[in-house]
Amino acid sequence: MSALAKPADWVDSPPLAPEGPVLDLDHLERMTLGERELEREVLMLFAQQSADLLARLEKLPREGASLAHTLKGSARGIGAFAVADAADDLERRLRQGLPVTAEVAVLAQAIGSAQAAIDERLQAL
């Protein structure tokens, strides 16, 4: 007789690394109609807003889903799709009442990568 192993408890897989650039410059150019000054303004606004929203999210967890939703829209607007995807995952889990420690970390990392890409882009403009 062989003993059957007990099935392991379900554990969520870590999020996959997004494919493509951190900042989709083609999308950004379409959204800003090719106007470099508008692009600069939008990128600077997103950089500030994303840092502020992340800080607020950590201090005000009850507002987390709304903050994540706001960040998701802003990120999509500039072509920071990894940030948008991370914010979407966080928003969904918060609305379901699920733990979000890993999702907050993924979002913070995505924002950090986007900030670096924005800094690089602003220097190139």
Which role does the model predict for each range below?
Residues 9-11, 36, 73:
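Short alpha-helical transmembrane interface motifs in multi-pass membrane proteins
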Residues 21-70, 77, 100-122:
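Long, amphipathic alpha-helical coiled-coil segments characteristic
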Residues 89-91, 98, 102:
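Short alpha-helical "patches" and their helix-cap loops
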